A protein has these predicted regions:
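Acidic, His- and aromatic-enriched active-site or binding-groove loops in soluble protein domains
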Residues: 1, 35, 56-94
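Metal-dependent polysaccharide deacetylase catalytic core of the NodB/CE4 family, i.e.
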Residues: 1-43, 88-108, 133, 142
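Short catalytic/ligand-binding loop motif for oxyanion handling, primarily in non-cytosolic enzymes
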Residues: 8-12, 47-51, 72-74, 101-102, ...
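Residues lining hydrophobic/aromatic ligand-binding pockets adjacent to catalytic sites
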Residues: 18-36, 42-71, 107-116, 124, ...
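Catalytic grooves of carbohydrate-active enzymes
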Residues: 88-172
Length: 172
């Protein structure tokens, strides 16, 4: 996953600066992890079709991830892979904000009707997407872990267990 190097709003002000920052971030990811990012994420998931066209023109990304906002999607689901208008190859991955926010903000809220959130319960929610999508994109900021959800909430154990619980279900 790549983004702007300085977590900036450079796309809004200078496309040259924007491309330069992305290139710098790609270099950093490659240096530290030995990987070339294939998905782009703009600062705070800010998106428009012009951004997608610029990202596609860079020819180094397969997809871009952004919000799955209800007011934009209307009747459509964030749980499908879309193609940005005007793009031929770039895919658009939409954040499932409801399931993401269940982890990021509601996980340790004892007043939440679904508390406690366990890995097996969450895996069933993910599996329930079947028939209304073929992908669930969960996206949480790093501040989820340590600022919103402290270690003593069980968030780390939940995150370790979740993939295995999802894969246990036959439809996944």
């Amino acid at each position: 996953l790549a983004e702007t190097y300085y977590h900036s709003l450079s796309f809004l002000y200078s496309h040259d600066e924007f491309v330069e920052q992305i290139s710098k971030h790609i270099e950093a990811i490659n240096y530290f992890f030995g990987q070339r990012p294939r998905v782009f994420r703009n600062t705070e998931l800010i998106y428009n079709n012009d951004l997608a066209a610029l990202i596609e023109s860079m020819k180094c990304f397969d997809a871009i991830i952004t919000e799955g906002a209800d007011h934009i999607l209307g009747y459509r689901s964030p749980n499908f892979v879309y193609q940005p208008k005007g793009c031929e190859n770039l895919k658009l991955l939409l954040k499932n904000y409801s399931l993401s926010d269940d982890i990021a903000f509601r996980f340790s809220n004892r007043d939440w009707p679904q508390w406690p959130l366990t890995a097996d319960k969450f895996s069933r929610w993910v599996s329930n997407v079947n028939g209304n999508g073929n992908v669930v994109n969960l996206f949480m900021d790093y501040e989820t872990f340590g600022e919103h959800q402290w270690e003593d909430t069980g968030i780390s154990s939940f995150m370790r267990a979740m993939p295995g619980e999802i894969l246990k279900l036959a439809d996944n």
